Amino acid sequence: MKLKINSQGLKGRLKVPGDKSISHRSIMFGSIAKGKTVIYDILRGEDVLSTIEAFRAMGVEIEDKGEVITVHGKGISELKAPEKALDMGNSGTSTRLLSGILAGLPFETTLFGDDSLSKRPMDRVATPLQLMGAEITGQTDKVKLPMTIKGSTHLKAIDYVLPVASAQVKSAVIFAALQAEGLTKVVEKEKTRSHTEEMLVQFGGELKVSDKTILVPGGQKLVGQKVVVPGDISSAAFWLVAALVVENSELILENVGVNETRTGIIEVIQAMGGQLEILEQDNVAKAATLKVKASQLKGTEISGDLIPRLIDELPIIALLATQAQGQTIIRDAAELKVKETDRIAVVANALNSMGAKIQPTDDGMIIQGGTKLHAPENSINTLGDHRIGMMAAIAALLVKNGEIELERAEAIQTSYPSFFDDLEQLSENI
């Protein structure tokens, strides 16, 4: 795909697609609950479709009527063994969270995925589930896909300290804990996104959260609910950054999810001097309308507890930092190396090819700001990573002459199928 975007500024209002994390979890909770779950504004990306197809393969009736998805749950004990291995596509969320559910079911299931997902570490989720009594095997000593899970109907509760900041691993343990005998204790070193905990309560479940400790009693029964999915702040991030760095831009983004464990990017933008206003905020739905306009920005440091609250936004934040005055340092973000790609290396290579000055480090990047971007000599390959593709498309807005050749742009379908339509709406034709 060739990107040549002659933007004189981005203008308009936009409702970004539904939150990917909440969309996955709404299908999962609806499938293990008893009764009907009705989901509005779900994300229709490839990752979420992988979750839907997995539960259909286990006997769950899931109706898709366009604007509304209805899940007819019969309870977790009614899930059936799938007739064949489950295809997780590119979805790490589907794989890891589903593993927690499968750990307590009386059958054996094999999960497989695409080349990118098959390289990602699954031992981090296999280890606690094995401690609880599930049998999990992969193709190597370090568990990766394809992975086979033989569940146990006698899972035992555990006390588990998460070795890495991972909402996916935490969620897998919580899903398994619902089926375990006793009280499971999960301790986070750094707080990660809290959607699983909040949705468990919404579906009639019970848990106690105290700072970074979560207590989950076993043997719980859940009840179907109505779920309205807010817009995904990780998708909104691309437009927030675009409006900040493209001259004469002003955007209003409606119904953006602002769960406090996900709003690190808002704090970074404010720390960098960006003009960002929260116009309307619904504290119950945890959603807000955001107004953002082109701004003079300054460098900052991003590290520590902030990292899990913006881990998925770091690629586009790196682009933002190239346009700020001064130096931006990102550290404590080694987790970027085991995303869909090694995002430290891939982001640095892509933006440096356009004239940025980014030094990759073991756990982040050092970015010199105030650089003008130009068209790269060679194409930029997403390597199947949706966030790299969208970052490159936003970077193209800053290229005055020439165009960007983007390879494997279809990866963007993973999380934002309407991305290029929205880009066209907010700027000029691609």
Curated annotation (Swiss-Prot):
Q: Which UniProt keywords apply?
A: Amino-acid biosynthesis, Aromatic amino acid biosynthesis, Cytoplasm, Transferase
Per UniProt, where does phosphoenolpyruvate bind?
Answer: K20, G92, R120, Q168, R343, R387
Name the catalysed reactions: 3-phosphoshikimate + phosphoenolpyruvate = 5-O-(1-carboxyvinyl)-3-phosphoshikimate + phosphate
UniProt GO MF annotations: 3-phosphoshikimate 1-carboxyvinyltransferase activity
The entry's localization annotation reads:
Cytoplasm
From the UniProt record, give the pathway where this protein acts: Metabolic intermediate biosynthesis; chorismate biosynthesis; chorismate from D-erythrose 4-phosphate and phosphoenolpyruvate: step 6/7
Query: What residues make up the catalytic site?
Result: D312
Taken from the record, one Pfam family name reads EPSP_synthase
> May I have one GO cellular component term?
cytoplasm
Q: Which domain of life is it from?
A: Bacteria
Span-the-membrane segments of this chain are none
Looking at the keywords, is Cytoplasm present? yes
Give the E.C. number(s).
Answer: 2.5.1.19
User: What family name appears in the similarity comment?
Assistant: Belongs to the EPSP synthase family.
Q: Which PANTHER family match?
A: AROM/DEHYDROQUINATE SYNTHASE (PTHR21090), PENTAFUNCTIONAL AROM POLYPEPTIDE (PTHR21090:SF5)
As for what it does, the entry says:
Catalyzes the transfer of the enolpyruvyl moiety of phosphoenolpyruvate (PEP) to the 5-hydroxyl of shikimate-3-phosphate (S3P) to produce enolpyruvyl shikimate-3-phosphate and inorganic phosphate.
Quaternary context: Monomer.
Q: What is this protein called?
A: 3-phosphoshikimate 1-carboxyvinyltransferase
